[in-house]
């Protein structure tokens, strides 16, 4: 064989071995490509949202009293009682019966007017409202415990990372990786 051919084969073999050696160094020295997720705990916040809850209710009112002292009932009762009392007895007894009838009638008229005033009512419909709170949960993120080799770390993420978190060439977590 020719010396130049042997030299060419030797240079080719040496170059191939050199490339293979450099490639194998990079493969064997390369660290992990993913961090293993040990746990991912959801972080939630309870949110109370206020709202108005209204309903219509029937309300009974007493009409305003125009004769608070019930004078009308007392006077009418006294007159009626006096007339009825005057029908009994004779002489001086008639006068006593008239006075007793007037007093009894006045009292009865007063009580009747009071009873009528208390039962003099009207109804209206009113809207009654109260504030109630609806509860809901808002997801804040996840507290993630991860492991790279023998080292363990914690981080808060806004999504569940699954079982692995990718690493960049420097061994740092890639957190903006869209899934």
UniProtKB/Swiss-Prot annotation:
Subcellular location: Membrane
UniProt keyword terms in alphabetical order: Membrane, Transmembrane, Transmembrane helix
GO-annotated cellular components: outer membrane
Membrane topology: Single-pass membrane protein
Transmembrane segments: 5-25
GO biological process: regulation of single-species biofilm formation
Annotated Pfam families: Rick_17kDa_Anti (PF05433)
UniProt main location, coarse: membrane
Matching InterPro entries: Bact_OM_lipoprot/Surf_antigen (IPR051407), Gly_zipper_2TM_dom (IPR008816)
Homology family: To Rickettsia 17 kDa surface antigen.
NCBIfam families, alphabetized: PRK11280.1
Protein name: Uncharacterized protein YcfJ
Upper classification of the organism: Bacteria, Pseudomonadati, Pseudomonadota, Gammaproteobacteria, Enterobacterales
Name of the encoding gene: ycfJ
